[in-house]
Amino acid sequence: MTNIRKAHPLAKIINNSLIDLPAPSNISTWWNFGSLLAACLALQILTGLFLAMHYTSDTTTAFSSVAHICRDVNYGWLIRYMHANGASMFFICLYMHVGRGLYYGSYTLTETWNIGIILLFTIMATAFMGYVLPWGQMSFWGATVITNLLSAIPYIGTNLVEWIWGGFSVDKATLTRFFAFHFILPFVASALVMVHLLFLHETGSNNPSGISSNSDKIPFHPYYTIKDILGTLLLILILMLLVMFSPDLLGDPDNYIPANPLSTPPHIKPEWYFLFAYAILRSIPNKLGGVLALLLSILILVIIPLLHTSKQRGMMFRPISQCLFWLLVADLLTLTWIGGQPVEHPFITIGQLASILYFTILLVLMPIAGIIENNILKW
């Protein structure tokens, strides 16, 4: 008799994706982040669902409803802080996952990579809209500043902004629609995750060596299921340490002040995971130029496969490219720091230099390094 997991139409899909899936025998912990991201998404949908049961998307009651969740709802504080810090963990895992893809040349699986970029945009949009919902000062002004950037689009800009706002300023209509989108987008992301996996399973996973692993595959279960469970437990441990001991460590104190359109906070800044892009936006004195640079800072990932000049897939045996990769990581950390600083000397100059370096590494230096390394191999 055939095993039910191999015969049943639904069980067969799960079996071929999570149990009998042939996986490379040498994938490292850097390959854990996919499952960690799935765990984060599940956690965010679950905690978000319970928050939505008590939240009201009205400008007069939104702030109070969040306070009510924290004070009066059973374990409401826990659900709220798990959701807020879960987003931070989500982005840490996201950036690690993308970084792994860049380092080991996983972007050569172009369909998987491109769906991943769409996923990244979806989750960034979700996080941005989620930050607006508590209706604190930073929520309101963050929404105002970021949506206002669309007014830089020639001809249709102003109409577009007012259409998104649902009026002439960020108000009740904006909050209501942001809540609606914030609720629906994670489900869109879940569907995209399925497509992401579909494309990945067409080709199979990459591995640290960058060479084909078809001659040496092992079943996903039990080897990688147990490895993923370990990773998930560590993720939950770090998240719960954050939630229990310093839930507001990564937040902004200004968001505990109710939104006031008449009082601008001294430093308007997004959540920490958007600071690098915000720094790139601010480093260009022109509004439209800044918006384009902001978009390109993420969209540049689309052309990474086209800029691959090396004969080797990953960077495991390419020291020059390795140096450039870690320089890029340092540069992104610098941009993140700059994004949180006021717009004054010397931060403006540092931000501009870091922004130029970011694009130079990806567009110029890495392709050149690939060519140099190809030539070194001939000697």
Curated annotation (Swiss-Prot):
Pfam families registered for this protein in UniProt: Cytochrom_B_C, Cytochrome_B
Membrane-topology descriptor: Multi-pass membrane protein
Positions of a ubiquinone binding: H201
Any one cellular-component term (Gene Ontology): mitochondrial inner membrane
Binding locations of heme b b562: H83, H182
Chain sites annotated for binding heme b b566: H97, H196
GO MF terms, alphabetically ordered: metal ion binding; ubiquinol-cytochrome-c reductase activity
This protein's record includes keyword RNA-binding: no
Keywords, ordered alphabetically: Electron transport, Heme, Iron, Membrane, Metal-binding, Mitochondrion, Mitochondrion inner membrane, Respiratory chain, Transmembrane, Transmembrane helix, Transport, Ubiquinone
Listed cofactors: heme b
Family, as annotated: Belongs to the cytochrome b family.
Task performed by this protein: Component of the ubiquinol-cytochrome c reductase complex (complex III or cytochrome b-c1 complex) that is part of the mitochondrial respiratory chain. The b-c1 complex mediates electron transfer from ubiquinol to cytochrome c. Contributes to the generation of a proton gradient across the mitochondrial membrane that is then used for ATP synthesis.
Additional detail: Heme 1 (or BL or b562) is low-potential and absorbs at about 562 nm, and heme 2 (or BH or b566) is high-potential and absorbs at about 566 nm.
Complex and partners: The cytochrome bc1 complex contains 11 subunits: 3 respiratory subunits (MT-CYB, CYC1 and UQCRFS1), 2 core proteins (UQCRC1 and UQCRC2) and 6 low-molecular weight proteins (UQCRH/QCR6, UQCRB/QCR7, UQCRQ/QCR8, UQCR10/QCR9, UQCR11/QCR10 and a cleavage product of UQCRFS1). This cytochrome bc1 complex then forms a dimer.
Record-given protein name: Cytochrome b
Organism expressing this protein natively: Eumetopias jubatus
UniProt lineage: Eukaryota, Metazoa, Chordata, Craniata, Vertebrata
